[in-house]
Swiss-Prot record:
InterPro entries to which the protein is assigned, alphabetical: Cys-rich_flank_reg_C, ELFN_Fn3, Leu-rich_rpt, Leu-rich_rpt_typical-subtyp, LRR_dom_sf, LRR_TM_domain-containing
Quaternary organization: Interacts with PPP1CA.
Residue positions, PTM Phosphoserine: 461, 645
Protein name per the record: Protein ELFN1
Lineage top rank: taxon: Eukaryota
Organism: Homo sapiens (Human)
Biased composition (Low complexity): 632-649
Organismal lineage: Eukaryota, Metazoa, Chordata, Craniata, Vertebrata
Primary subcellular site in the record, as a coarse category: membrane
Domain Fibronectin type-III: 312-399
Domain named LRRCT: residues: 190-252
Job description of the protein: Postsynaptic protein that regulates circuit dynamics in the central nervous system by modulating the temporal dynamics of interneuron recruitment. Specifically present in excitatory synapses onto oriens-lacunosum molecular (OLM) interneurons and acts as a regulator of presynaptic release probability to direct the formation of highly facilitating pyramidal-OLM synapses. Inhibits phosphatase activity of protein phosphatase 1 (PP1) complexes.
Amino acid sequence: MAGRGWGALWVCVAAATLLHAGGLARADCWLIEGDKGFVWLAICSQNQPPYEAIPQQINSTIVDLRLNENRIRSVQYASLSRFGNLTYLNLTKNEIGYIEDGAFSGQFNLQVLQLGYNRLRNLTEGMLRGLGKLEYLYLQANLIEVVMASSFWECPNIVNIDLSMNRIQQLNSGTFAGLAKLSVCELYSNPFYCSCELLGFLRWLAAFTNATQTYDRMQCESPPVYSGYYLLGQGRRGHRSILSKLQSVCTEDSYAAEVVGPPRPASGRSQPGRSPPPPPPPEPSDMPCADDECFSGDGTTPLVALPTLATQAEARPLIKVKQLTQNSATITVQLPSPFHRMYTLEHFNNSKASTVSRLTKAQEEIRLTNLFTLTNYTYCVVSTSAGLRHNHTCLTICLPRLPSPPGPVPSPSTATHYIMTILGCLFGMVLVLGAVYYCLRRRRRQEEKHKKAASAAAAGSLKKTIIELKYGPELEAPGLAPLSQGPLLGPEAVTRIPYLPAAGEVEQYKLVESADTPKASKGSYMEVRTGDPPERRDCELGRPGPDSQSSVAEISTIAKEVDKVNQIINNCIDALKSESTSFQGVKSGPVSVAEPPLVLLSEPLAAKHGFLAPGYKDAFGHSLQRHHSVEAAGPPRASTSSSGSVRSPRAFRAEAVGVHKAAAAEAKYIEKGSPAADAILTVTPAAAVLRAEAEKGRQYGEHRHSYPGSHPAEPPAPPGPPPPPPHEGLGRKASILEPLTRPRPRDLAYSQLSPQYHSLSYSSSPEYTCRASQSIWERFRLSRRRHKEEEEFMAAGHALRKKVQFAKDEDLHDILDYWKGVSAQHKS
């Protein structure tokens, strides 16, 4: 009482201090605050109106919270999780009937918990979960009937436990065994049922040293034969201890015997010297027994068996779920003795109990409706006795989420249908792809055939065009009089031969090979040897064909002669190379250039081509006829050679290139027909005339030199003497003609690319269009033949013609005399 008085006085002093300092933070709670808003104490007891739940407006830094004497009915984790600093919590004298499992798990600093004078019915492990620092636990004056053996396992630091004034009948021997710091355990005013099940707890209690020494207030209330016995034998009516009685009656197998049933009493009286059958205690000896162990009366009093609660424990009410639906449930309740007590089915919702129905049958099915999914519903079987409600067993129901409707299960026939459909689709795709592939391949073949036909047609047309270009004058003027024989003319009376390409430029005028269209090779050595006709050499490769054997028989004599002069040809080629090398070696300085003489064939070819190969006889005549037909309308012009002129290196180089090109161009037509010595006319100078002709040809731009890029500037030819008188034997003006503008078809036959642009792909020459367009695969074939060196494609007559063209009068006669000697020696 003194302690309570001092506590009340302290509360009054604290309240007065708050009123004086203005520390009243809320109208419903008295707060004692520290620095920076820290709250030490919050007194919320006896609130008007009383609290029905833990208030949330209190600062979370609170250390001491007092909510006693309100109407709080439940303790939830959500309402206490904010108060992490809480060390003292007073919930005394409320209406708490439900504590959520883990409700105090956020108060790991809590040391004092007061829950006295409430309506708790049982104590479980989950209620005290997380209270590792708890030291004082007050649960007095509740309705606790069951204390689980694991209730205090998470509270190893408990020093004081108060479970007095409850309804505890049984306690397990291991309930308080793990509490090493326990010094006070108040269990008085509980209706203990003294049976063999309580023997283990009584042994622990006898060994425990209770600081309060309240043994006289712990008594047995049932069974009636042991009513009034003290748990430890210290009482007002003698020294009767239930511990000694149970130790004398109960054995190690007492729990198994109690499950089977109560022991049968001994029949008859016990005789001295003979032991009664178990389970009575051993027979008394002659020695006097202790006062607390002797029975009243004489020794012939029969032993009375102690009734136990084993049958009652087995006969507890049972509740189980029978059926669950979307919004309802059916439960089954079994009662051992429905008429011994009044049983009801209660629904607990946050410690608020509501009666569902009264239970009056030994087994009854109850349907629960208007339930929601994913919601916990707790139902308990409660009995009422002497105005008190006893909770026997509970059941929690949670309706699951509505299951989704199951999808249709495919039948075996449906699965087979799906499989066949998939296989059919795959087979159809294969057929479609095959058809597409067949169509594409067929179309490709048709395109290839069309390309081949077009190439053949183009080749035929080109062949015809080339023939017309080369032999057009013969077709147009077949009655043209041949050139009359006569002596060689002087320079002033000689007509000019059209401009011809050089020998080194022969390769670029060959037709590019193709897989479909044959191409021609002009002036090659094999042409001379085999004697192919000119029509075959226009659009075919210069290689011997299958009919070459017949041609060899006809030209065997001439071929042998040509073989004999191979050495002369090689010497001529060497001479050409030496001339080119010596010409390129001149870079600057005054240079005197002697223009080479120009050669003209003025005699008829029918009588002057005894030493020519068959391939050169007709072509030479055609070129001369074409030349004369074009020159007929051209004005005459004389040209003189320039010597001793001083020019810059660039101008000299440009003129030298022009001279080389002019000489090469003049050599083209002489190769076609190499006449005898008496049919060659020397025209001096020729380089100036050829330069003027090339310069004017480029100005006309009629595909005469169709190649990209710039050309070296050629200086104009110096003025020459007046043109010589015409040659009467030819019936036309015998003079050097200016380059005339010929008709386009004929002009294209003479227009070739410059040899310095061999590598360029663009060309407007009609001879280059003889090949068919090649596909991309044919262009990159590794087996394509590469161009050979220029010396390999130079014909024998080619070199000889060049040497004859640039030779002077004496040299020309020497060459021809040597040629005749070789021929005569070969014939002999």
